[in-house]
């Protein structure tokens, strides 16, 4: 139960937990930027001040739809304003996607997230291109 979970975290050490979460966040931000370039907007605080959370949007994609597509890929995230509407308003956005990895998550799972986001973005770009041109690719 809850008591055992607390004992488990105390055995690991909260400083170690925070260090690992920040490491996952740093790796995730780097990978998302490498994978999606200018198309990703990351709103998380810098990893040295964060708690491992990755908050982001992909330009042109609705956060709720993005979260739904990630769910279809077996990746759990949240979308919306996350009880932080004033923060979202100050960022000039209404909602975002949030991935909240913890000590049971791995670097490989962060890679899965980046790969899935690229796949979803590519599907969207192909669909958008098809709607605009009636063709699935520019050379067709």
Feature-to-residue mapping (PLM):
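Pyridoxal 5′-phosphate
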Residues: 1-140
């Amino acid at each position: 139960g809850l008591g055992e979970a607390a004992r488990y975290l105390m055995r690991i050490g909260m400083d170690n937990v925070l260090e690992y979460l920040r490491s996952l966040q740093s790796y995730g931000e780097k990978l998302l930027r490498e994978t999606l370039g200018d198309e990703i907007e990351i709103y998380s605080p810098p990893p040295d001040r964060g708690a491992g959370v990755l908050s982001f949007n992909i330009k042109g994609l609705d956060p709720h739809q993005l979260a739904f597509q990630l769910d279809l890929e077996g990746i759990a995230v949240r979308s919306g304003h996350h009880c932080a509407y004033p923060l979202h308003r100050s960022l000039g956005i209404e909602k975002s996607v949030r991935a909240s990895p913890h000590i049971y998550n791995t670097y490989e799972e962060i890679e899965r997230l980046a790969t899935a986001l690229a796949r979803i973005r590519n599907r969207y770009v192909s669909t958008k291109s098809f709607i605009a041109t009636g063709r699935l690719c520019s050379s067709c």
